Amino acid sequence: KVNEIRMANGLSAVQYSASLETTSVVRANEITTKFSHTRPDGTDWYTVNANLQYGENLAEGYNTADDVVNAWMASPTHRANILKPDFNTCAISTTTQNGRTYWAQEFGI
């Protein structure tokens, strides 16, 4: 879905990154306890791996990929991440706690 949007806007597709998936799993789990771009330990979101992470989109409560991507595209800051030409890698992870789904999308260059 993200790549369809990027390509429709004249951008190259982002490629899956296993390394970014590791960071997105960490962030998805962290936001179940503190929904913020600040990590539960008080550090910035990108400190999971500052050598890889250059953009982040978070969401909670959406049940489908279409719903969460549509919500991100309706938000100027999240949309800017999805459409940033410099980003060429991406990973998205989800986790569910107490019936609520949390999403972490991490971008790299």
Specify the residue positions occupied by each region the protein language model found.
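A short alpha-helix/helix-coil micro-patch that ends at or immediately precedes a cysteine
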Residues: K1-T32
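Short, functionally important structural connectors and interaction interfaces within domains
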Residues: R6-A8, S12, A50, A74, ...
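Secondary-structure boundary/capping signal
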Residues: A13-V14, R39, F87
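Flexible, active-site-adjacent loop/turn segments at secondary-structure boundaries
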Residues: V14, A18, E56, A80-N81, ...
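Short, surface-exposed glycine/acidic/tryptophan-bearing loops
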Residues: T22-D66, I82
